[in-house]
Amino acid sequence: YDMNLLWNAEEDIRSLKSLILFGVRGMAAYAHHAMMLGYADEEVNRFFAKALFAVGEDWGMDALLPIVMEVGEKNLKCMALLDKANTETYGTPTPVTVPLTVEKGPFIVITGHDLHDLKLLLEQTEGKGVNIYTHGEMLPAHGYPELKKYAHLKGNFGTAWQNQQREFADIPAPVSYTHLTLPTKLEV
């Protein structure tokens, strides 16, 4: 698809198609996370094709607006699927107090919202003397019983994903990006 067709389209059409693209993009991340845990929904999966097809067509607002609304409906369904996948895999989360200080010693920061990647990192670093700190959207991981049982999941570092460049600039540790990455200063 020639994206210039979208970017040069009339403002309302461009806006509706952008809503579809950005909504499907986020939904794809949630669907992928659920799929990594063995959960999928065929209705959600089929909708990806329908939504992307709509972006490629020369449709007016009357045809695109229902697709935009359906993006919201399918996103809600996809979030419910991911919630089911996460709770059935990692347990029902409960509110917890999460330390915001970093202990002395080696550590890794993990950012994004892929709990499966966090679980793999926790398994690989268990007993190695390396502490793990969440960042941004990974913060809720501390509430899941199957994740908080790891003693080296120590706390949360920093704030939200859009502050990655500033917050990661001088930390003496590697960062594992699972999603929502901004280019570092060296990449800009």
Please name every model-derived segment:
Residues 178-184:
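Conserved small/polar residues in nucleotide/adenosyl-binding loops
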Residues 148-163:
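Acidic, Ser/Thr-rich peripheral helices and adjacent loops at domain boundaries
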Residues 173-176:
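Substrate-binding cleft of carbohydrate-active enzyme catalytic domains
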Residues 127-130, 151-154, 181:
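Short, low-complexity, polar/charged sequence segments that are solvent-exposed and flexible
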Residues 1-144, 169:
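Catalytic cofactor-binding cores of redox enzymes
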Residues 97, 162-165:
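Catalytic micro-motifs at enzyme active sites that drive phosphoryl/nucleotidyl and oxygen chemistry
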